[in-house]
Design a protein with these regions (language model features):
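Short C-terminal tail/terminal secondary-structure segment
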Residues: 2-3, 92, 96-97, 230-231, ...
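C-terminal substrate-recognition "lid" of short-chain dehydrogenase/reductases
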Residues: 120-123, 135, 219-248
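Active-site helix of classical SDR
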Residues: 123, 160, 168
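Alpha-helical segment proximal to the catalytic Tyr-Lys
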Residues: 128, 147, 173-174, 239
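Residue(s) in the substrate-gating loop at a strand-loop-helix junction
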Residues: 143
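Short, small/polar-rich loop/turn modules that mediate ligand/substrate recognition or access, typified
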Residues: 176, 181, 186, 241-243
């Protein structure tokens, strides 16, 4: 299978490190014009350096609907309609697992804002252009927590990622008549960024062994494993696949 994205315009959110950086690099290597977006400007600059001339960096908070609309309008004005959107921005926002009675409304809401509302705002912004050209690919990055439970016990994270999977399925049916596919990649635990490194260390040797014992392949994955799944969903080879969730977790 020869996958290329020459001449295609791709937006990747959460591109400053981890999955997002790997996804942006993968698209850049395959000929795409990549718009790498993140709120972390310093780390985003490193992604841009690695991607080279194939990428443009944009400091963006996906929770800000107006900023999202402005950025997509700018990209469309420069490159034409967006061909591929990868909603990767997300995370636990610095939180750790705590009892439900200790969770404040703001603790709950901030995780929903970045993991679910951000994906909604981005899809909402690119949809008109994709409809106009009669094609498009939206790939949302959720988590195994959205299909089962959160390893870290963060209620809002598991709930927001489950909600993102529901959004994926709903948008697949809504946007399908315009040739737009919407799919979801649900990663297992991957040591891909500072947060997951802290989580891994906090597990200790026994907890780490339990995680590995629960994986069929008995090893953790890498960011490139997630990027490869995204490339497939974004490619012409996946043109008759929509509304699907692909677990990339080494086997559970």
């Amino acid at each position: 299978m020869n996958i290329r994205f020459d001449g295609r315009t791709v937006i990747v959110t959460g591109a400053a490190h981890g999955f997002g950086r790997a996804i942006a690099l993968a698209f850049a290597r395959l000929g795409a014009k990549v718009h790498a977006c993140d709120i972390l400007a310093e780390e985003l600059a490193e992604t841009l350096r690695l991607c080279g001339d194939a990428a443009t960096a944009h400091t963006l908070d996906v929770r800000d609907r107006d900023a999202v609309q402005r950025l997509v309008a700018e990209i469309v004005g420069r490159d034409g309609a967006v061909d591929v959107l990868v909603n990767n921005a997300g995370g636990v926002c610095g939180q750790v697992g705590r009892p439900i009675e200790d969770i404040s409304p703001s603790d709950w809401q901030v995780i929903f804002d970045v993991n679910l509302s951000g994906a909604f705002y981005m899809a909402q912004a690119v949809a008109p252009g994709m409809k106009a050209q009669g094609r498009g690919r939206i790939v949302n990055i959720s988590s195994g927590a959205g299909l089962g439970i959160s390893l870290t016990g963060i209620q809002a994270y598991a709930s927001a990622k489950a909600g993102q999977i529901g959004l994926t399925r709903q948008l697949a049916h809504e946007l399908g008549p315009w040739g737009i596919t919407v799919n979801n990649v649900a990663p297992g635990f991957v040591r891909s960024n500072p947060t997951t490194e802290r989580q891994w260390d906090a597990m200790g040797p026994e907890g780490q062994k339990r995680v590995l014992d629960g994986i069929a392949l008995k090893r953790l994955g890498a960011p490139d494993d997630i990027a490869n799944a995204v490339l497939f969903f974004a490619s012409d080879a996946a043109g008759w696949i929509s509304g699907q969730v692909l677990s990339v977790d080494g086997g559970k």
